[in-house]
Amino acid sequence: MSDDDERGEEYLFKIVIIGDSAVGKSNLLTRYARNEFNPNSKATIGVEFQTQSMLIDGKEVKAQIWDTAGQERFRAVTSAYYRGAVGALVVYDITRSSTFENVGRWLDELNTHSDTTVAKMLIGNKCDLESIRAVSVEEGKSLAESEGLFFMETSALDSTNVKTAFEMVIREIYSNISRKQLNSDSYKEELTVNRVSLVKNENEGTKTFSCCSR
């Protein structure tokens, strides 16, 4: 048996990070992918992505995480950005209520351009700035519950909950995929298009709710 056979099936999941400009999307990604933080990071134009791997049930799971990298300033995020996404982090800045108020628009756009089974997490970023908080934990939690989302507060600056948030979404994607029936021709075609290798898992995952309390 080859090493590849012993390692088992490989998965590739596309995850998108969405939200208003300057909420910290790029810093969340670089903190998770490279454990780096740049306080002077500037919005760039285009789409960037990082790939991270983790093991779930003995299988290698790769998450290809896409960042809008400034496109949202021009409302130019299109269906191409969402195509094939099986997970999404919707980010707002806890110090700017307008970014929280715009979460609904981002969710509408996500729901328009993606499958209803996308694993979604609402992220209240910059929880290190407690002294100038404008959106309470309770408000974030309430919105997440009403929309059926996971919820967590994070800080790209000090790493609070960053790894936990990404890995929770990745695990939820794996659970969602494992529950899907593979005997549908249309579903098999979808897997081929999205480049996601899947197997049926006997253990069904249970969705949990989590938030950061300070």
UniProtKB/Swiss-Prot annotation:
Changing residue 71 to L: Loss of GTPase activity. It is found in: Golgi apparatus membrane; Golgi apparatus, trans-Golgi network membrane; Cell membrane. Expressed in roots and actively dividing cells. It is a lipid-anchor. Induction: By abscisic acid (ABA), phosphate (Pi) deprivation, cold, sucrose, mannose, and water stress. A lipid is attached at residues 211-212 (S-geranylgeranyl cysteine). One of its GO terms (biological process) is response to heat. A motif (Effector region) lies at residues 41-49. This is Ras-related protein RABA5c. It comes from Arabidopsis thaliana. The lineage of its organism: Eukaryota, Viridiplantae, Streptophyta, Embryophyta, Tracheophyta.
